[in-house]
Amino acid sequence: MAGKRDKVRMISSAGTGHFYTTDKNKKNTPGKMEFLKYDPVVRKHVLYKEGKIK
C-alpha cells in the first residue's frame, strides 16, 4: 500500500532556479504550499511555491 505523503518541490519565486524538496500529506494539505525560505543565490528570504517533481 502506498504512503500518504507525496514528495513535492518548492521552487523559488526569485527565478534563480533554486529549489528545496519536501513532502506533504495530501489529506491534510490539499492546496499548494507556500513558504518564505532562504535563497542562497540571491542571499535573501523569498517565497517558495510548490511544484511537481519531474
UniProtKB/Swiss-Prot annotation:
Record's keyword terms, sorted: Ribonucleoprotein, Ribosomal protein
Keyword match Ribonucleoprotein: yes
Entries under SUPFAM superfamilies matching the protein: Zn-binding ribosomal proteins
UniProt key word Methyltransferase: no
A biological process term (GO) from this entry: translation
Domain of life: Bacteria
GO molecular function terms listed in the Swiss-Prot or TrEMBL record: structural constituent of ribosome
A Pfam family it matches: Ribosomal_L33
GO-annotated cellular components: cytosolic large ribosomal subunit
InterPro entries per UniProt: Ribosomal_bL33, Ribosomal_bL33_CS, Ribosomal_bL33_sf, Ribosomal_zn-bd
Sequence similarity: Belongs to the bacterial ribosomal protein bL33 family.
Name of the protein in question: Large ribosomal subunit protein bL33
